[in-house]
Amino acid sequence: MEKKKLIYIVDDDLFINTLIVKRFNSEDYVVESFITGEECLDSLDKNPDLIILDYLFTGESLIFSDGMQIFDKIRQLKPQIPVILLSGQEKGEVVLEFARKGVFDYIVKDNNLIDNLAVSIKEVFSREV
């Protein structure tokens, strides 16, 4: 039996976190959710197979205020882990910057979020074969 893939979702929006965990926790995936980048980074020793990362975070006590900072730290610590970025809006310059840095995919949080994420997750794991 093949080991389940470990996916991290990092988003300060509890609705999005819950939606993704409920949809993708399955026979194939184990999904762990985090509200802050710090929580995710503290758990990188579990070596997730994929990280789904929000672009914009809110909160006064956060060390990391946006997904770019968290992404850079993930790349520094675990460069082999693919990252899918989520955002509430399409920003061309942000998409280009993340593409240059090596993000696997950039998905807008819209009505097609779950469908688009499902396709992207399959693409990530199909490239491992």
Give the label of every model feature segment.
Residues D11:
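Conserved acidic carboxylate
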Residues N116-V129:
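Receiver (REC) domain switch/output surface
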